[in-house]
Amino acid sequence: MAEFNNVSIAKAASVLFEGNITSRSIEFEDGSRKTLGIMLPGEYELNTVHTQIMDIQRGNLEVLLPAKEWVTYEGPTTFEVPANSKFKLRVHSLVDYCCHFVKNGI
């Protein structure tokens, strides 16, 4: 899907790691939510509450999921992060991403 229709977009950005990761939240008519953002090169550790499906549009990064080894991803690609977990990122080039939050079957 190249574009989203009939959505509400948060005006304010979520800014993490001194601006190295930024995103904007979008909400769909069915209540589901995604974020659209970028990650600049660096190393980061993030937490999840809900399962996240990370859709990498472009860029190169390595991901360390719980109880796994580092895996390299080159966009376009997708990977899943389990709910209630911490994961690490090594971002090697600007990453353009869309994150889908899976909760309550949505």
Regions found by a protein language model. Name each.
Residues 17-19, 46-48, 72, 80-82:
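Short solvent-exposed loop/turn micro-motifs enriched in small/polar/acidic residues
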Residues 38, 48, 65, 91, ...:
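Residue-level recognition of conserved beta-strand positions in structured domain cores
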Residues 22, 26, 35-46, 64-65:
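Compact, glycine-rich, soluble single-domain proteins
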